[in-house]
Curated annotation (Swiss-Prot):
Organism: Dechloromonas aromatica (strain RCB)
Keyword terms, alphabetized: Cell cycle, Cell division, GTP-binding, Magnesium, Metal-binding, Nucleotide-binding, Septation
Annotated protein name in UniProt: Probable GTP-binding protein EngB
PROSITE patterns reported in the protein's UniProt record: G_ENGB
All copies of domain EngB-type G, residue ranges: 23-199
Listed GO MF terms: GTP binding; metal ion binding
Source species taxonomy: Bacteria, Pseudomonadati, Pseudomonadota, Betaproteobacteria, Rhodocyclales
Domain of life of the native organism: Bacteria
NCBIfam families recorded: GTPase_YsxC
Family from the record: Belongs to the TRAFAC class TrmE-Era-EngA-EngB-Septin-like GTPase superfamily. EngB GTPase family.
Amino acid sequence: MPLFQKAVFLTTVANLRDLPQDSVREVAFAGRSNAGKSSAINTLAGRVRLAFVSKTPGRTQHLNYFTLDEGKYFVDLPGYGYAKAPEAIRSQWEGLIGPYLSKRDQLAGLVVIMDIRRPMTDLDLRLIDWFRPTGRPIHILLSKSDKLSRQDQTKALRSVKAEVATWGDADLYSVQLFSSLKKAGVEEAERVLASWLDIEIKQKENKGPPDKGSPGAKMP
């Protein structure tokens, strides 16, 4: 049973003045257009259409807030990097998302979703460089891991971990494999997000041997 299964849509925010005013913690999800961001949110919530999955990249252009059972929030940020996005939309992204990421006191951490076949693009790194000065944690989901063999998954994971290790502050940064299609990596992601949101994870009944899951998330 997903930890965040009671997530429900709350509101869409197009201007910073419309952000929720309560002081509860929230986690933001960012990623390139079509990297699997909305699918990852839906998978973590155990829902099919909580976050809208568009076949048209760059469609989502506002902050979408989802309320969790514990009163905390998931925030779905607009996908970035879609080349055909009009200049006005790109400017809106920078005008809304930049201040949100740098100044939102309630933001507990940032989840960056990257297609495992094309991780650490220039735009991914620009976003991360934008966020790192806040001193808040970043968790990278290498999505669509089912598209690669186990050997290539491990190779990609090691490569991204090696680059992340150069950032220093190892406790702030973590990486894992994730597949919305196979529901792989869900519990691993839940543990990270629960710690950020200060949510207790109830022990699950052990009905068999432990799931080996993906090969590691924490930085060495």
